[in-house]
């Protein structure tokens, strides 16, 4: 009977079943990779030192923004009776939302197109029936003479 493989030795070394690793993302309850973002912050040399909470906070902010854009783009796709989100839906979602539009004002979305916008001056006049009634009412009165 080999006891060293089933139980851990002195100081917790050797043998025993390995625990499943728990990532920083799981601990923080996020989907975005906290460890990778932390590595990018260090590698990018944005500062000499990076706090332990910075990658978690940044991952949470990025995850929130991605979820917000995806939700609005999904709504835009559903409005157009489509089941797949395309860049056009992302553009419509971002530009129609006041806060996201301000945040991404200088961003160009490839294959997004433009927002539909027709100047009111170029739109056709009101229907002919409504147009006939209003001029007669005004024409019935004679101008006052001094």
Curated annotation (Swiss-Prot):
InterPro entries assigned to the protein according to its UniProt record, in alphabetical order: Histone-fold, Histone_H2A, Histone_H2A/H2B/H3, Histone_H2A_C, Histone_H2A_CS
The UniProt entry lists the main location of this chain as nucleus
SUPFAM superfamilies linked = Histone-fold
Question: Motif span (SPKK motif)?
Answer: 142-145
* Sites of N-acetylmethionine modification: 1
Q: Which GO terms describe its molecular function?
A: DNA binding; protein heterodimerization activity; structural constituent of chromatin
**The UniProt record lists the keyword Acetylation:** yes
What Gene Ontology terms describe where this protein resides (cellular component)?
Answer: nucleosome; nucleus
Q: Where is this region: Disordered?
A: 1-24
An example GO BP is: heterochromatin formation
Q: Which UniProt keywords apply?
A: Acetylation, Chromosome, DNA-binding, Nucleosome core, Nucleus
List the Pfam families: Histone (PF00125), Histone_H2A_C (PF16211)
Q: Where in the cell is it found?
A: Nucleus; Chromosome
UniProt tissue specificity: High expression in meristematic tissues, in cells of the root pericycle and in shoot cortical cells undergoing endoduplication of their DNA.
Q: How does it assemble?
A: The nucleosome is a histone octamer containing two molecules each of H2A, H2B, H3 and H4 assembled in one H3-H4 heterotetramer and two H2A-H2B heterodimers. The octamer wraps approximately 147 bp of DNA.
Q: What function does the entry list? A: Core component of nucleosome. Nucleosomes wrap and compact DNA into chromatin, limiting DNA accessibility to the cellular machineries which require DNA as a template. Histones thereby play a central role in transcription regulation, DNA repair, DNA replication and chromosomal stability. DNA accessibility is regulated via a complex set of post-translational modifications of histones, also called histone code, and nucleosome remodeling.
Q: What is known of its domains?
A: Contains one SPKK motif which may interact with the minor groove of A/T-rich DNA sites. Phosphorylation of this motif may regulate DNA binding. This motif is reiterated in both termini of histone H1 and in the N-terminus of sea urchin histones H2B, but its presence in the C-terminus seems to be unique to plant H2A.
Its family remark reads: Belongs to the histone H2A family.
Tell me the protein's name. Histone H2A.1
Q: Which organism is it from?
A: Solanum lycopersicum
């Amino acid at each position: 009977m080999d006891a060293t493989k089933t139980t851990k030795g002195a100081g917790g070394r050797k043998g025993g079943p390995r625990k499943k690793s728990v990532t920083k993302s799981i601990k923080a309850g996020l989907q975005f990779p906290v460890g990778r973002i932390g590595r990018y912050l260090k590698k990018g040399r944005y500062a000499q030192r990076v706090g332990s909470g910075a990658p978690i906070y940044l991952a949470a902010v990025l995850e929130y923004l991605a979820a917000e854009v995806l939700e609005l783009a999904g709504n835009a796709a559903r409005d157009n009776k489509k089941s797949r989100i395309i860049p056009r839906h992302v553009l419509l979602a971002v530009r129609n939302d006041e806060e996201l539009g301000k945040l991404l004002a200088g961003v160009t979305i490839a294959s997004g197109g433009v927002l539909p916008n027709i100047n009111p001056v170029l739109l056709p006049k009101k229907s002919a029936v409504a147009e006939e009634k209003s001029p007669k009412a005004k024409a019935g009165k004679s101008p006052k003479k001094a």
